[in-house]
């Protein structure tokens, strides 16, 4: 018997998608939320932080353009621009993503309705959601501000991310994907370093997952990029599932461990430059094609080969052996974990349950790692910081 869809735990959305405070039901809502949090088997600190976030969210009320003051730009991608903003009525610092779409009002309203499911996504591994609204031709999605930014930004400063840190990242991504699948029957569809956010409290959270089919369709033509994290089955247009997210996670881990997007694989000379020593393993072999491969442009990494055209890159992902970690610089457990994520046949690829009990994850879970300390020293953040008023909890 299929699982019953979770009942919405949002504040009453208005037809235009803004969240409105129903003061009469606020206490009841909070009690219902607390019951849902109990089902998640969270650590005490995680539960306290989530409860604090949800309590302050109750005070936000209706979101509207006039109530925001821009602080700085956090980043821009295919989807739109993200700003760090101050919500003046509540005093909260938020991240506001602005998506400009030339669409009819009916489509716009459908997107806003579909995005309301984000109110139900409450997990330590998912970026908190304040609400969505429309103004001046743009859809605004208001989220928790993560002061460490995204892992692609962290990678640019770090050069490479250590295996122990990536162990903690892997746990968070697996738990985030598991939560989305088990509690909401949704897959992420866009796992990559820029969609994994971190903060000075040491939290690691997923953002920008595909909850709105209409938004995905409306933005289908906006892709501009030099790299792809899509699985071979998705690129070929065949049926895909959460197994596709696992491929994307595996490819992201190789990129963050090695220090550059790993397709095509680095040759022996580049590996020596990257790691400062001779590195063993298949990753150092020349790719099987007779041509000299290029590579996507990147602001980090030491590959001087000409950039690969996007169609050439996609062809490589589908037809050539998958990326892997070079031997000799990473543990066998980490190498095996990545290999199981990057099996080209999705039926043979490890699933979320198998990955959660993998030796690499078990070891990473047991390791004492000061993720917050590493992050703050790497990107020059003060620790602890206060991404929201809840930081002191």
UniProtKB/Swiss-Prot annotation:
Result for mutant: residue 222 to A: Inactivation and reduced phosphorylation
E.C. number(s) listed in UniProt: 2.7.12.2
Keyword line: ATP-binding, Cytoplasm, Cytoskeleton, Kinase, Membrane, Nucleotide-binding, Nucleus, Phosphoprotein, Serine/threonine-protein kinase, Transferase, Tyrosine-protein kinase
Secreted listed as a keyword: no
Catalytic class of the enzyme: transferase
Entry's transmembrane regions: none
Catalytic activity: L-seryl-[protein] + ATP = O-phospho-L-seryl-[protein] + ADP + H(+); L-threonyl-[protein] + ATP = O-phospho-L-threonyl-[protein] + ADP + H(+); L-tyrosyl-[protein] + ATP = O-phospho-L-tyrosyl-[protein] + ADP + H(+)
Chain ranges of the Protein kinase domain: 68-361
Regulation of its activity: Ras proteins such as HRAS mediate the activation of RAF proteins such as RAF1 or BRAF which in turn activate extracellular signal-regulated kinases (ERK) through MAPK (mitogen-activated protein kinases) and ERK kinases MAP2K1/MEK1 and MAP2K2/MEK2. Activation occurs through phosphorylation of Ser-218 and Ser-222. MAP2K1/MEK1 binds KSR1 or KSR2 releasing the inhibitory intramolecular interaction between KSR1 or KSR2 protein kinase and N-terminal domains. This allows KSR1 or KSR2 dimerization with BRAF leading to BRAF activation and phosphorylation of MAP2K1.
Region (RAF1-binding): 270-307
UniProt topology in membrane: Peripheral membrane protein
Region forming the signal peptide: none
Cellular-component GO terms for this entry: centrosome; early endosome; focal adhesion; late endosome; membrane; mitochondrion; nucleus
A GO molecular function held by the record: MAP kinase kinase activity
Cellular localisation: Cytoplasm, Cytoskeleton, Microtubule organizing center, Centrosome; Cytoplasm, Cytoskeleton, Microtubule organizing center, Spindle pole body; Cytoplasm; Nucleus
Biased composition annotated in UniProt, kind: Polar residues: 9-26
An annotated GO BP: regulation of early endosome to late endosome transport
Effect noted on mutating residue 208 to N: No loss of activity
Active site, per annotation: 190 (proton acceptor)
Matches recorded under Pfam families: Pkinase
Protein family: Belongs to the protein kinase superfamily. STE Ser/Thr protein kinase family. MAP kinase kinase subfamily.
Function, in words: Dual specificity protein kinase which acts as an essential component of the MAP kinase signal transduction pathway. Binding of extracellular ligands such as growth factors, cytokines and hormones to their cell-surface receptors activates RAS and this initiates RAF1 activation. RAF1 then further activates the dual-specificity protein kinases MAP2K1/MEK1 and MAP2K2/MEK2.
Alphabetical list of PANTHER family matching this protein: DUAL SPECIFICITY MITOGEN-ACTIVATED PROTEIN KINASE KINASE DSOR1-LIKE PROTEIN, MITOGEN-ACTIVATED PROTEIN KINASE KINASE 1
Protein's name in the database: Dual specificity mitogen-activated protein kinase kinase 1
């Amino acid at each position: 018997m299929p699982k019953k869809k979770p009942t919405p735990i949002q504040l009453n959305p208005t037809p235009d998608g803004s969240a409105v405070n129903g003061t009469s039901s606020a206490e009841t809502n909070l009690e219902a939320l607390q019951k849902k949090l109990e089902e998640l088997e969270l650590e005490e600190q995680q539960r306290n932080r989530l409860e604090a976030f949800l309590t302050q969210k109750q005070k936000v009320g209706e979101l509207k353009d006039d109530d925001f003051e821009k602080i700085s730009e956090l980043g821009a991608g295919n989807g739109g621009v993200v700003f760090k903003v101050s919500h003046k009525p509540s005093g909260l610092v938020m991240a506001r993503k602005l998506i400009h779409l030339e669409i009819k009002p009916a489509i716009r309203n459908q997107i806003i309705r579909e995005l309301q499911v984000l109110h139900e996504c409450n997990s330590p591994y998912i970026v908190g959601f304040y609400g969505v609204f429309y103004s001046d031709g743009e859809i605004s999605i208001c989220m928790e501000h993560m002061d460490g930014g995204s892992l692609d930004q962290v990678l640019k400063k770090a050069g490479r991310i250590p295996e122990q840190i990536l162990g903690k990242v892997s746990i968070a991504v697996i738990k985030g994907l598991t939560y989305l699948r088990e509690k909401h029957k949704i897959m992420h569809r866009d796992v990559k370093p820029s969609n994994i956010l971190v903060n000075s409290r040491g939290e690691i959270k997923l953002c920008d997952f595909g909850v709105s089919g209409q938004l995905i369709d409306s933005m289908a033509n906006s892709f501009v990029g030099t790299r792809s994290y899509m699985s071979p089955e998705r690129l070929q247009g065949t049926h895909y599932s959460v197994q596709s997210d696992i491929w994307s996670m595996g490819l992201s881990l190789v990129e963050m461990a090695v220090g550059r997007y790993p397709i095509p694989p680095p040759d022996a000379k580049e590996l020596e430059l990257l790691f400062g020593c001779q590195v063993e393993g298949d990753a150092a072999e020349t790719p099987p094609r007779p041509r000299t491969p290029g590579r996507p442009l990147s602001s980090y990494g030491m590959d001087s080969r000409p950039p690969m055209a996007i169609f050439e890159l996609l062809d490589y992902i589908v037809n050539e052996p998958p990326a892997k970690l070079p031997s000799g610089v990473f543990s066998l457990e980490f190498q095996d974990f990545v290999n199981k994520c990057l099996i080209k046949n999705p039926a043979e690829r490890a699933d979320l349950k198998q990955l959660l009990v993998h030796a690499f994850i078990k070891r990473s879970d047991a390791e004492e790692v000061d993720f917050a300390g590493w992050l703050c020293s790497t990107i020059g953040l003060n620790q602890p910081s206060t991404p929201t008023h809840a930081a002191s909890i």
